[in-house]
């Protein structure tokens, strides 16, 4: 009982000591953390001080903040220092308590060892009677010896545990797991004397008591040394005590192991580690333990008794070490698992050193493994064994893997299955993949992938390609045939020569029989060489011809493709005449184009609002048809376009740009529809839906004129051609011209946009065609650049053409008045060149603003009119009778401005290349890329607004200065009168169309002021610019300070309906105002020059 109490006290002391140790560890951690924080804070303070040294003194607040920060840092540093000192003191206190507890524990251990001595005596007596108890004592002694290398006696072993406990405490505080090292050194350190001393007992005991150590003894041992599970003879007496104590000791050992590295042997000693509860738990009859032990016992006995004690000691220490290890934690549970197997209890993992105990050890290790996974010693042993086993396995596996070879077929199948599995998984994640895998994408032909629009071009491209290939093949075949023929001819010639030579040789041979053979041979050699040379020459020439043919074909193709691009701007002019004629059929419904243009003669009267329209249409009936064909030709065929554009450029007058203002009355909607289709073709759905409708169209008309002048670099066109185009835009011709360039794009939309175009035509159908044609096709950059060139060119052209325009104006004055009256008649007659002229006059009539313009800028309207009439009449005339004539006529003006148009073309070529084919097809006006249309539309609207302002100003000026009755009548017949009166400054080269002129007047009155304004808008940018300039001039004369905004407001009043229909106001931004101001200033400067 005393023993049990001692064990309990010891356990309590151990628990308290462990508690102190954990507290010390925690404090040390805190201390480390505090030290780190202190170091960090100090470094931070130093860094801040260092950084602040070079900082200039800041505001008081900043200084205060810095000071507070430094104070806070210093305070933190002080706090940390205080904490560190406090923790150090606490750690010292805990360590002192721990030392006291450890001393107490040592005292208890000494007492326990004293009691153990008595048990040992008993065990010795038992061992003599029944070796089991002796064996257990030997094991216990062995444990003591292993634990204490110093102890030589059993007493010493008893004393050693306290020492070991101290060592263990130190180790635990250091968290060092040196148990293994200590056990081994202990065993090894045992002097032979010690070994012999203990072995003496161990030999006798081992022999006698393999696993039957007396339980009480086991108790003692278990407490200090884990006596191996001792089912000693005394088990009955001390069974209960042993069980309780052993369990407590086991618990403590487990706790110690868990908390510390009790795996060390010291742990076992201190923790009474394996109190191998087994000793008590393994209680069994003395016989049974003996029997259980007998298996291993015989060996032990044999080894112990027979083997010299030294050997036995060597093994027993190992066993003891093993037991000690078990005590550390391995064997704590072993005894319970090994109930009845007293041998197993003694056999600790370490006992594996002895072959006999190894089996026991193996068993024990299994049991210990179950409960003692935390033991490092055991883990160490496990590492050894499993590592070996694992290495062996690896070797085996490697060998096995080498052998593992599947047949290629099986591998292929497995690979297929693997891929299918991967596919199935991938399909789950991305079902779209399934379509690709399971239904591999059947390569779609290009035709299936392309849209309808592109499909047609692709087919044409393929056809061209096939044609080229066929042509090349044919050429090759022809060349080959020629070569063959040449070769045959050469062969024949050679044969003839040979025959001749043979004859000669024969003659020679007859005459000179001796020399004949040599001569013949010689001749033959010559012939052969000749043949070779000839064939080479033939091959060379054939190849050269073939190469030339290929080059020619390539050049022609390249020319055909590149021409539209090169003349992208000129086609602009050309389209005015040529394109219009070709494209109106395309853009307008081709059938209707011809019919409509023809009807234009009759409709021209109706279109008196758009006298230009009637003129161009009437002209369009004949010339427009011709022009349409020409346009279609040039546009449909890039090569054709190129020539047409060239012709236009050559036509000095951009009148060929049939800017016949087609101010179509509502009744003329048929024509307007056709034109609107063409115009609408120009207009994109976005443009139509942009709320710009009529206004947009009008602005677009101006834009078309501007773009015509700009894109064409149509400085001439801008005035004559542009003004003409403005009216032309109204007229089918102008519409067709402008829209025709656009027709490719607008063909489809033209019909859809007919309504819009009609509204445009009402407000200035001409504008839709020109605007539509221009705005979509013309690139904004081109417009801008061309606009600059055009403005300059306009000034120059105006100066040059003022005379012409004046002459034309005088002609137009009479002709236009007549055409206005006879516009309808001219409309019918318009098919001829005269009709376009007449129609041009009506467009002038149709734009009352033009009249005002004419009055204010008399030069411009007159010139415009003259140019219009000339242009439309010439282009239509040329178009009907000869498209080139129109082109040529245009070239004269174009000749003057050709440099501008060419420059503009060159500038626009790069940007247009992408969209050029379609845009160019549409005509010079279609040089704009669709992306730029919005900008161009804005510019157009701005120009339209400017034109409206100018119209208002002109109206005022007309009222004030009514230059002539025509001018007064101009409001009713704005375009005609305006054109007449604008003669002096305008570049219009009007070839008065007598009959259209008659129609013009009648159309003019019909044209509403809106249409007149629209007609004005269709005027070329040059016209509008000149009119604006004149208006500004008049403003200066009148000292009118109306800002462009106020003038816009006035124009809004005049054209309130148009403004309501459109959203021009939203376009009036500061930039727009500045832009307008810039245009006026530039014009003024130019005029002043």
UniProtKB/Swiss-Prot annotation:
Covalent cross-link (Glycyl lysine isopeptide (Lys-Gly) (interchain with G-Cter in SUMO1)), residues: 370
Phosphothreonine modifications at: 743
Keywords: Cell membrane, Coiled coil, Glycoprotein, GPI-anchor, Isopeptide bond, Lipoprotein, Membrane, Phosphoprotein, Ubl conjugation
Any one Gene Ontology molecular-function term assigned to this protein's record: protein kinase A binding
Cellular component terms per the entry's GO annotation: apical plasma membrane; side of membrane
Biased composition (Polar residues): 329-347, 712-749
Spans annotated as PKA-RII subunit binding domain: 782-795
Membrane-topology descriptor: Lipid-anchor; GPI-like-anchor
Effect of residue 794 to A: Reduces binding to RII
Annotated GO biological process: actin filament organization; cell surface receptor protein serine/threonine kinase signaling pathway; protein localization; regulation of cell shape
InterPro entries, alphabetized: Paralemmin
Biased composition annotated in UniProt, kind: Low complexity: 348-357, 471-508
Domains as described in the record: The RII-alpha binding site, predicted to form an amphipathic helix, could participate in protein-protein interactions with a complementary surface on the R-subunit dimer.
Protein name: PALM2-AKAP2 fusion protein
Organism whose genome encodes this protein: Mus musculus (Mouse)
Underlying gene: Pakap
């Amino acid at each position: 009982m005393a023993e049990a109490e001692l064990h309990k006290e010891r356990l309590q002391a151990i628990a308290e000591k462990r508690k102190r140790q954990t507290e010390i560890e925690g404090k040390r951690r805190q201390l480390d953390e505090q030290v780190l924080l202190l170091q960090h804070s100090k470094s931070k303070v130093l860094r801040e001080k260092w950084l602040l040294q070079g900082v200039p003194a800041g505001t008081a607040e900043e200084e205060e903040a810095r000071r507070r920060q430094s104070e806070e840092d210093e305070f933190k540093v002080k706090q940390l220092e205080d904490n560190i000192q406090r923790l150090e003191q606490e750690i010292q206190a805990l360590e002192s308590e721990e030392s006291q507890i450890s001393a107490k524990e040592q005292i208890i251990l000494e007492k326990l060892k004293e009691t153990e001595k008595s048990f040992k005596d008993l065990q010795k007596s038992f061992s003599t009677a029944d070796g089991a108890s002796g064996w257990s004592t030997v094991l216990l002694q062995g444990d003591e010896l292993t634990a204490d290398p110093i102890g030589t006696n059993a007493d010493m072993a008893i004393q050693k545990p306290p020492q070991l406990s101290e060592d263990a405490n130190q180790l635990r505080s250091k968290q060092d797991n040196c148990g293994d090292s200590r056990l081994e050194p202990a065993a090894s350190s045992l002097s032979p004397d010690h070994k012999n001393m203990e072995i003496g007992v161990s030999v006798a005991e081992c022999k006698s008591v393999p696993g039957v150590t007396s339980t009480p003894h086991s108790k003692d041992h278990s407490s200090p040394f884990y006596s191996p599970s001792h089912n000693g003879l005394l088990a009955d007496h001390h069974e209960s005590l042993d069980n309780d104590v052993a369990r407590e000791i086991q618990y403590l050992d487990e706790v110690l192991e868990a908390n510390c590295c009790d795996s060390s042997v010291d742990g076992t000693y201190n923790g009474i580690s394996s109190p191998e509860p087994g000793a008590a738990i393994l209680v069994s009859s003395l016989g049974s333990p003996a029997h259980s032990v007998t298996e291993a016992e015989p060996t032990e006995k044999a080894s112990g008794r027979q083997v010299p004690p030294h050997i036995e000691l060597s093994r027993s220490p190992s066993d003891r070490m093993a037991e000690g290890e078990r005590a550390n934690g391995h064997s704590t549970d072993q005894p319970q698992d090994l109930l009845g197997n007293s041998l197993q209890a003694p056999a600790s993992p370490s006992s594996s050193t002895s072959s006999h105990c190894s089996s026991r050890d193996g068993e024990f290790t299994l049991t210990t493994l179950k409960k003692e996974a935390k033991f490092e010693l055991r883990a160490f042993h496990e590492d050894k064994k499993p590592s070996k086993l694992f290495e062996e396995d690896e070797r085996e596996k490697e060998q096995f893997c080498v052998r593992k070879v599947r047949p290629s077929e099986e591998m292929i199948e497995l690979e297929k299955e693997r891929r299918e599995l991967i596919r199935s998984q991938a399909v789950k994640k991305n079902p779209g993949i399934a379509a690709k895998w399971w239904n591999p994408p059947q390569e779609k032909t290009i035709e299936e992938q392309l849209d309808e629009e592109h499909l047609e071009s692709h087919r044409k491209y393929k056809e061209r390609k096939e044609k080229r290939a066929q042509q090349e093949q044919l050429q090759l075949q022809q060349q080959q045939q020629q070569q063959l023929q040449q070769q045959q001819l050469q062969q024949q010639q050679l044969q003839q020569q040979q025959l001749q030579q043979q004859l000669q040789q024969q003659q020679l041979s007859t005459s000179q029989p001796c020399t004949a053979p040599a001569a013949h041979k010689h001749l033959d050699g010559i012939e052969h060489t000749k043949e070779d040379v000839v064939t080479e020459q033939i091959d060379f020439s054939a190849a050269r011809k073939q190469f030339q043919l290929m080059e020619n074909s390539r050049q022609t193709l390249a020319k055909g493709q590149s021409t539209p691009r090169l003349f992208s701007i000129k086609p602009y002019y050309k389209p005015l005449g040529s394109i219009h004629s070709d494209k109106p059929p395309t853009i307008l419904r081709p059938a209707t184009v011809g019919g409509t243009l023809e009807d234009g003669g009759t409709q021209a009267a109706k279109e008196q609002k758009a006298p230009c329209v009637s003129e161009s249409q009437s002209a369009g009936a004949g010339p427009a048809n011709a022009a349409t064909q020409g346009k279609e030709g040039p546009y449909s065929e890039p090569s054709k376009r190129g020539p047409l554009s060239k012709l236009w450029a050559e036509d000095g007058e951009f009148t060929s740009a049939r800017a016949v203002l087609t101010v179509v009355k509502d009744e003329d909607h048929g024509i307007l529809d056709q034109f609107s289709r063409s115009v609408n073709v120009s207009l994109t759905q976005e443009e139509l839906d942009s709320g710009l409708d009529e206004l947009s169209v009008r602005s677009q008309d101006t834009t078309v004129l501007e773009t015509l002048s700009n894109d064409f670099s149509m400085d001439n066109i801008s005035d004559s051609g542009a003004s003409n185009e403005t009216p032309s835009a109204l007229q089918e011709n102008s519409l067709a011209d402008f829209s025709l360039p656009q027709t490719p794009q607008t063909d489809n939309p033209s019909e859809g946009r007919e309504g819009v175009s009609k509204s445009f035509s009402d407000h200035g159908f001409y504008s839709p065609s020109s605007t539509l044609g221009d705005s979509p096709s013309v690139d904004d950059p081109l417009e801008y650049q061309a606009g600059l060139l055009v403005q300059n060119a306009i000034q120059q052209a105006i100066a040059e053409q003022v005379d012409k325009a004046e002459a034309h104006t005088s002609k137009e004055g009479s002709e236009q008045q007549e055409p206005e009256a006879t516009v309808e008649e001219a409309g019918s007659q318009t098919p001829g060149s005269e009709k376009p002229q007449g129609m041009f006059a009506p467009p002038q009539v149709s734009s009352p603003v033009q009249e005002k313009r004419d009055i204010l800028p008399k030069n411009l309207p007159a010139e415009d009119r003259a140019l219009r009439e000339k242009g439309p009449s010439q282009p239509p005339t040329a178009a009907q009778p000869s498209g080139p004539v129109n082109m040529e006529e245009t070239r004269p003006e174009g000749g003057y401005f050709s440099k501008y148009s060419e420059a503009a073309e060159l500038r626009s070529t790069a940007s247009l290349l992408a969209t050029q084919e379609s845009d160019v097809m549409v005509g010079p006006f279609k040089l704009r890329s669709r992306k730029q249309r919005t900008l161009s539309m804005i510019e157009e609207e701005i120009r339209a607004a400017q034109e409206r302002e100018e119209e208002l100003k002109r109206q005022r000026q007309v009222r004030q200065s009514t230059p002539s009755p025509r001018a007064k009548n101009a409001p009713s017949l704005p375009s005609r009168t305006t054109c007449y009166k604008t003669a002096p400054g305008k570049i219009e080269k009007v070839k008065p169309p007598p009959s259209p002129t008659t129609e013009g007047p009648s159309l003019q009155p019909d044209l509403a002021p809106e249409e007149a304004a629209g007609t004005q808008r269709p005027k070329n940018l040059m016209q509008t610019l000149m009119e604006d300039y004149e208006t500004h001039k008049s403003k200066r004369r009148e000292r009118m300070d109306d800002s462009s905004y106020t003038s816009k407001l006035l124009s809004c009043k005049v054209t309130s309906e148009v403004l309501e229909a459109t959203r021009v106001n939203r376009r009036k931004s500061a930039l727009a105002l500045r832009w307008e101001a810039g245009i006026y200033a530039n014009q003024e400067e130019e005029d002043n020059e």
